[in-house]
Amino acid sequence: KSGLHQNAVYALLKEAPSPKEIASMHMTHLANLLKVNSHGHFTKEQAKELRVLAQKSVGANDSAISIQITQTIQQIELLDSQLKKIEAEMTDIMKFNDSVIMTIPGIGYINDGMILGEIGDIHRFSNPNKLLAFAGLVPSVYQSGNFQAKTTKMSKRGSRVLRYALVNATWNVVRNNATFKAYYDAKRAEGRSHYKALGHCAGKLVRVIWKMLTDEVEFNLE
């Protein structure tokens, strides 16, 4: 979690959901609350700065908004808890399933489950391009004069869940496999953005996954 989604922020807003309540908190209590719930990331100086900002806040003290903030945080925490349970169940299922794509460095059980769940029977796809199209990772060719370039672009078509899982998995694979890292770096060196370079790598990963699932072979780029 990062930004607004931090345990320290939730803990503070549940106890003091308005600037007035934060401003009136005892400094020691405020500093300790933030420190404990951020595992030491919030310092006493930051707590002081926060209380000063709260004291300077001119916003209306609306109790209805305070109640809404508290209830929203409780809903987020409930969803977080449910998500963790689902992810734990997915991990157990994927460990039992022992799919060949788990041999891909960095792919992870959750991405594995999302990818396999969306693909279903790999034999529905007679070639990797059909799987690419299903994922919304469409191979395209741009031509201008004597220049021809092939790219993999993101599309709003296809399975959004599969596309999300593939792109997320691809970034993990890039950071854990030298061949994919070199391919990513080469695309970046060509002047492509991080997202476009990742799209190329995702296209490569789809072809690898298609081959692995079709032939029931483990990850091997040699």
PLM regions and their residue ranges:
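A detector of single, family-specific signature residues
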Residues: 1-222
